[in-house]
């Protein structure tokens, strides 16, 4: 009976402990909150400056300063270790009354959340504007302006692309309507500056000669051109043949003369200038020979002038060289006279030679 009562008391106590014990995560949060609150509430600790930069010579000479430094370190660490142990024990201790610890844990969580939020804002660069400097604010303003400018540019590009697509669609529909207009405009009554180019091969020499003979009218070559001497000789030869034919057969000579006149008229009708007047040909030949003689005289005069100029420049050059040579010799003589030499030229001038 006593064993059953003991077992029942043991199970009831165990159930109370399990029910009263909080979960693992709140315990950790409570301990962290308590430690942080205690640290925040506690006065700032005075950190002792440790003598870390000691010279190597003193360490080599004596070991006593080392022992003292190690003793000081151990003494300085003892209160810290004791405080840590106290914090750990206080965190591990479960309060008998769980409702009394809840306000402290909630306050610690709020403090932690506030600190975390502040750190996140500082990392993002979105802290309060009062704490930021003017350079940071200017930098933010420039970044914002750059973002706005890029947005506007992207918006303009999208608008241009839409307009181009709309224009292409309109052009695709317009050609069907423009084709009849172009066909109607392509039927004028007269066309100017229309040049038809054929891909014919150039004619050879025999073909050109044949075409030239076909162009002749009455097998009579027209008296055209500016070779007045040749035209005059041809005209005189034609007149001599007519005189010879007139002596033999007057009728045939008249027929040939009429044929020649008619052929000349046909050539003149086509716009060819016929030079069949012997007097005019002789005058033209005289004028041409006169102009040729004038050009010949002008050319000869020009060549003579050029040759004279060249000779004049050559003579001037030679004269300048002689003067330069004489001046050089005179300078040498002057130098010799300054040195006290007696020259034969001076003796001749003095009449002592």
From Swiss-Prot:
Keywords: DNA-binding, Nucleus, Phosphoprotein, RNA-binding. InterPro entries: Rrp14/SURF6_C, SURF6. GO terms for cellular component: chromosome; nucleolus; nucleoplasm. A motif (Nuclear localization signal) lies at residues 45-49, 149-153. GO terms for biological process: ribosomal large subunit biogenesis; ribosomal small subunit biogenesis. Residues 72-86 have a biased composition (Basic and acidic residues). The modification Phosphothreonine is found at residue 221. Its main location: nucleus. It comes from the Eukaryota. It is found in: Nucleus, Nucleoplasm; Nucleus, Nucleolus. GO terms for molecular function: DNA binding; molecular condensate scaffold activity; RNA binding. Residues 44-53, 139-157, 206-216 have a biased composition (Basic residues). Residues 19-100, 121-218, 292-353 are annotated as: Disordered. Binds to both DNA and RNA in vitro, with a stronger binding capacity for RNA. May represent a nucleolar constitutive protein involved in ribosomal biosynthesis or assembly. This is Surfeit locus protein 6. It comes from Bos taurus.
